[in-house]
């Protein structure tokens, strides 16, 4: 038999001269399969430059400047100096801006990873104890001045003005008691002006982040006067500021203070800002309390007394007539999706600069004296043209003027400021009135826009 074997119809043999005999691969067409591996370009993923989630850098903490020598200062009653847009721009580029930033951020850094319970009574200095006594007496004045019966009205209660008058009358006495005559009366007058503006506006019967800032500026004045030291910073936040929050919550609920400059549901909080900055620092590296924990009622109940952030969220929840952060505080709800507290703390630093110090409607009420000086070139307030800050009508944005009806406005003459709008009662007042009538709702229907 012939050594070659045919395949019949294909006619392809396996003899000596065939491709199979030579070891070459066979295709159906009888040709060698080409190696395409080297011809096809290698697939590589595109390397896109990752943009930061927030292009605005986290503000750093400036170094605290040296404190002034009190003997070189000419003490004065603090007054408003941000009357025009250019005044605000001068302030943002001034040493006082850096002074405020360094003081607030230094306070925040001092309480990193520290619960309130870590500060014992034995750790408190005498000035800190004296400040706590002042806050205790302020609370007592509030309880001694019960609100008038307004027939169920949810607007600010006018007895609040009587309460503020009592605080102002006691202010000099309080300072003289704990300063012990170490400072001249003019210094006491300057420092006490900030405390007087820390509990709300007498005319508008409202309260906002600007009043909260005034309380911190009062503490800054005491630091500038060497009454408080850097070693007191931790106690200042965790004991003094925490106590201030307790007193303010009582005042807000007693007199139905309206939120000053509130963003409504789209704001962080109707009244406060700093509990979120200081509170995020407290939780910076916490092992098990994550940002999502603010949705857990048991966590808020168990740890709210120890961490300012959680305590403020718990208070906000208690004052809303609709349950769920998603509905009444969507910004807090959004922030809770952050990966860690470091992200939140950095965001709160940005927000303090952008939403407090860089907001003209907030800073137009800021007071400048010798301890927190105005920048050179800023406008000077005419004492004959404007009343005191506590009697100032609702603030606006740029320019102070009176219209044809004699109403004072603080914004562009062609614009529409907060002073022109209809007063809106606080949600806190709504919740309190519901409780008084025994109407406790677990859920309210929310209308569509």
Swiss-Prot record:
<keyword id="KW-0697">Rotamase</keyword>
<feature type="compositionally biased region" description="Acidic residues">
    <location>
        <begin position="389"/>
        <end position="403"/>
    </location>
</feature>
<feature type="compositionally biased region" description="Pro residues">
    <location>
        <begin position="54"/>
        <end position="69"/>
    </location>
</feature>
<dbReference type="Pfam" id="PF03095">
    <property type="entry name" value="PTPA"/>
</dbReference>
<comment type="function">
    <text>PPIases accelerate the folding of proteins. It catalyzes the cis-trans isomerization of proline imidic peptide bonds in oligopeptides. Acts as a regulatory subunit for PP2A-like phosphatases modulating their activity or substrate specificity, probably by inducing a conformational change in the catalytic subunit, a direct target of the PPIase. Can reactivate inactive phosphatase PP2A-phosphatase methylesterase complexes (PP2Ai) in presence of ATP and Mg(2+) by dissociating the inactive form from the complex.</text>
</comment>
<keyword id="KW-0413">Isomerase</keyword>
<dbReference type="GO" id="GO:0005634">
    <property type="term" value="C:nucleus"/>
</dbReference>
<dbReference type="InterPro" id="IPR004327">
    <property type="entry name" value="Phstyr_phstse_ac"/>
</dbReference>
<keyword id="KW-0963">Cytoplasm</keyword>
<dbReference type="GO" id="GO:0000159">
    <property type="term" value="C:protein phosphatase type 2A complex"/>
</dbReference>
<feature type="region of interest" description="Disordered">
    <location>
        <begin position="378"/>
        <end position="416"/>
    </location>
</feature>
<dbReference type="GO" id="GO:0003755">
    <property type="term" value="F:peptidyl-prolyl cis-trans isomerase activity"/>
</dbReference>
<dbReference type="InterPro" id="IPR037218">
    <property type="entry name" value="PTPA_sf"/>
</dbReference>
<dbReference type="GO" id="GO:0008160">
    <property type="term" value="F:protein tyrosine phosphatase activator activity"/>
</dbReference>
<comment type="similarity">
    <text>Belongs to the PTPA-type PPIase family.</text>
</comment>
<protein>
    <recommendedName>
        <fullName>Serine/threonine-protein phosphatase 2A activator 2</fullName>
        <ecNumber>5.2.1.8</ecNumber>
    </recommendedName>
</protein>
<dbReference type="GO" id="GO:0007052">
    <property type="term" value="P:mitotic spindle organization"/>
</dbReference>
<feature type="region of interest" description="Disordered">
    <location>
        <begin position="1"/>
        <end position="72"/>
    </location>
</feature>
<dbReference type="InterPro" id="IPR043170">
    <property type="entry name" value="PTPA_C_lid"/>
</dbReference>
<dbReference type="GO" id="GO:0005737">
    <property type="term" value="C:cytoplasm"/>
</dbReference>
